[in-house]
Amino acid sequence: MKTDRRYDLDWLRVGGVFLVILFHSLMIFILEPWALVYIKDSTYIYPFKAISNFIHLFNMPLLFIIAGMSVNLSLKSRTTGQYLKDRFQKLLLPATFGCIILNPIMTYIYQLSINNTTGFGEYIIGFFTKNPGDLSGIEGCFTPAHLWFLIFLFVYSLLSLPLFTKVSQTKNNVAKKNISDLLAKPFVLIVTVIPILLAAAINILDDKNPLVYFVMFLLGYFLMTSDHYRLALNRDKWGYLAIGGICSFLGVYFGNLFEEWSGMWIMIQIATQIARITIVFALLGMGNSYFNKASKSLKFLSNSSFTIYMIHFLINTGVGYIVIQCPLNPLLKFTIILALTLILSFLFYIIIKPIPLLRTVFGIK
């Protein structure tokens, strides 16, 4: 079954990957322990903290919701067997390759930056044999690093398949129509924050809470079950943007000022989750309204975005390791790191694209 391509989702996915690269580049200049990247400058650029916090608020929710929407489209044009094969080839295989080959190199660069003189061979053995602890990789042990996103998507794809199959087989369901009619009313979609809040109350892996992102992945799928939702997001996009802007201000600037589980802390957490979802709704509405168009540049960017997501963090770390040692203005260092990460990531994609084995392990279509 042929489906109409949603070019706006391609544009938003490309934008989301760029924001991940920007986020990791900003974090090099945020010296607080929670700002986890594998290279650090000696200068703290304080405005970068607010910028990175804002990006972090909505960017991964955007990517997970788009992933759920894309799964809906994928299942319309594939059998269950084809879908599962695609998930193994496009998610599990690249994630496994990256965790085994890319991440040890990246975390070894971190060890060099802190003057750890352990040889690479010895380090590799420790990477796979030490207790992984919190999975950050900071102590020289195993980490999925940024590839946690691919691992989560693979698991979600398997867990949700029975539900998605059941939903797709339900035709002309009156209850489904009534639900879509209700949720498509002005700003009613905001109630979808309730299951996200419930998931967030179960604290697992902090900001990588798999329950929260699973709910967002499911939400993405269900947003594609009725065209009413697309029209509603287009209609309400500016209102969602205003709500998201106000709530994100509260979350970014007041999130850490109150005692955990106090009344004000709970209110700020609610505002934060509302911000995450409403900013994504605004972006989906704006994307469909203004960017649902094909172009040659979009084809290249969309085809390369998965590979660039995989490789950018290693390149960012390697470039950062060199640049932070140069006697340059910190803002200039940041600009150079960001620019070189983008350029070298695209060059890497262009170089490996004709090589069948590398195409496979880097998820190139």
Where are these predicted regions, by residue range?
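Transmembrane alpha-helical segments
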Residues: 67, 155, 159, 163, ...
